[in-house]
């Protein structure tokens, strides 16, 4: 499996008392700690297919097919701001692109 297939994600690495500053996305499948000050996660990973979650909106993982294929049941996506991140190469970080 090519390393570029990996998703971006945010994963907390400490207890809820950890002092945080800002969210970080990962490169080529390497997950960095979630450092979002607005949401507290108790050692529970938060991720989505191709983008780090916004700090102020806690979201479950949503498969891409739910967003692109209308024949699947649609989850509650009313408050989700969709941003697509593209990894052009294994050495490049995820780059935001307009939908």
From Swiss-Prot:
InterPro entries: Keratin_matx. GO terms for molecular function: structural molecule activity. One of its GO terms (cellular component) is cytosol. The modification N-acetylalanine is found at residue 2. Sequence repeats lie at residues 3-7, 8-12, 47-51. Keywords: Acetylation, Keratin, Repeat. Residues 3-59 are annotated as: 3 X 5 AA repeats of C-C-X(3). Interacts with hair keratins. In the hair cortex, hair keratin intermediate filaments are embedded in an interfilamentous matrix, consisting of hair keratin-associated proteins (KRTAP), which are essential for the formation of a rigid and resistant hair shaft through their extensive disulfide bond cross-linking with abundant cysteine residues of hair keratins. The matrix proteins include the high-sulfur and high-glycine-tyrosine keratins. Belongs to the KRTAP type 3 family. This is Keratin-associated protein 3-2. It comes from Mus musculus (Mouse). The gene is Krtap3-2.
